[in-house]
Each structure stands twice: as C-alpha cells, then as structure tokens.
Amino acid sequence: MSVTVLSLQSHVVQGTVGNSIAVPVMRAMGVRAWGMPTALLSNHNGRSSVAGIPIDSEQIDAMVNALDSNGELKHVDAVLSGYLTPRTGPAVLRTVERCRALHPDTIWVCDPVMGDMTPDGELRAYVPDETVSLMTDAVQHADVVVPNLAELGILTGTEPRTLDDIVRAARSLTGPHLVIVTSMPYHCLLYTSPS
C-alpha cells in the first residue's frame, strides 16, 4: 500500500521549489502525492520580482471539503506544508486538524518557508511579520520541522553560525518531535529532537 501525502505549498512557474518539485519527486518515489497550491507564483519569493495569483483560506477549505466528500481525505498519511501566507495559513492548520481527526497517525511535516541566507552570509526574511508569527505558531504543532539555517534563526530569534549554535537553536524549538536543519555550511546531516 502506498503512502499518501497532501502537499500544501506554493506552485511556481519558474524554479524548483514548493509543489513544483515536491510532487514530481514524491510521485517518482512511489508516493501518492496530492499537490494543493497555497500560492501561484511566477518564481521563488526571494527573487527581486515576483507576481502571482492569490489563494485564500476559503479556496483551500473548499478543495479539502471536496476531497473529504469524495472519501479521499481519510487516506492522508502525511501533510507537507511549505510556503504559507496569512490568507492561507489558517486553512492549512484546519486541514492538518481534519486529517488527524480522520486518521490519527497523520504526520505533519512543516517547512517554514520564510527566508534564506544572502550571498554574504546574512539571514534574511522575505515574508511579512504576519507570516513569521504564523510560522512560529505552526511549528509548535508540527511533528517534523524542516527549516533552513535562516528560518531556524527567524524561528528562534538567534543567528546560529556554529554547529553548537545550530544544535542549541534546533533543540529550543518546542513542539516538533524532529527538527531537520537544511542548507547548513557543514558537510553533515543534522537532525535533533527538541527534548
């Protein structure tokens, strides 16, 4: 039996982020991946020019309601969330709750898309403060959190530079069972449990 993942992320025309890359990769691995857009964008939000079509909570709720009416939502084993906006975040949180109510073992993997490191090594947020607040709350309810180094700093109010800083910051996140930090300047894979 195949694993089913509901992937709630942005879809971009140009680039390999969000559902534009996650869904094809998961499908190639034999996962039943369902891509639901949280934003339709021209490209990655960190670029100098971005255009898009807004998605709101009502549209996400309607798509989730249709999946539920068709008897499909109960098959979701995991929810993967990525780029969220204040308009879509509440619906994504409701979707996770609905999936867990139908299938209590549903895992939520949250990629708190909020920023990146600049070429000169500065941590930079490219989302509004409302989104930072939303993500800070969301990660407390997720099972797995997958921040990049900048996002880890944004979530923890730190500027992790050394491996010890990174481990300390990852362990300070409350809520998730597992924190996987990506895009570190070290040749290792770091994962940690907050406790």
State what each model feature region is.
Residues 176-178:
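Acyl-thioester C-C bond-transforming condensing/cleaving domain
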Residues 2-110, 114-122:
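Conserved N-terminal subdomain of the carbohydrate kinase-like
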Residues 191-195:
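Conserved small/polar residues in nucleotide/adenosyl-binding loops
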Residues 27, 139, 174:
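Anion (oxyanion) recognition and catalysis
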Residues 78-168, 180-189:
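Conserved beta-alpha-beta core of the PfkB/ribokinase-like small-molecule kinase fold
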